[in-house]
């Protein structure tokens, strides 16, 4: 099922589930990854889904097409990205878990990025939600990963210094002629 932004969509905080929610107005609800302690005060006043939200939705949806995720996972990632941009409290970078490359890439919101874990050198796929001069707020763009003994799931937020981030290259986009 494909979801499409609608001016009947509504943001609200659900006390029972301790999560930011989005009422999709067709009997469907989206429960974000973000609990009360992670949200700004704006999150606790119900709000409509505005034109800016819809524009960001379509931008993130387009950028997420290349991720190796199911349609449902991509939709979940996009909606969590909207919650993060609109309602997430500022975070401190947690870059010590990742390999530094010594060069600075300044990603743009919606960019597919990757980092490598310092301890295992495992690649981790990310969606850049907000970008600054030195660090970027990212969401995990894969089903799960364990970072320093803590399990992260699709859509979890982490801020990372730009010298750890690399643009993600979509292997499927290369042709045989380019490889030879």
From Swiss-Prot:
Belongs to the ZapC family. Keywords: Cell cycle, Cell division, Cytoplasm, Septation. This is Cell division protein ZapC. InterPro entries: ZapC, ZapC_C, ZapC_N. It is found in: Cytoplasm. Pfam families: ZapC_C (PF07126), ZapC_N (PF21083). Interacts directly with FtsZ. Monomer in solution. GO terms for biological process: division septum assembly; FtsZ-dependent cytokinesis; regulation of cell division. GO terms for cellular component: cell division site; cytoplasm. One of its GO terms (molecular function) is identical protein binding. Disruption phenotype: Mutants divide almost normally under standard growth conditions. HAMAP family: ZapC. Contributes to the efficiency of the cell division process by stabilizing the polymeric form of the cell division protein FtsZ. Acts by promoting interactions between FtsZ protofilaments and suppressing the GTPase activity of FtsZ.
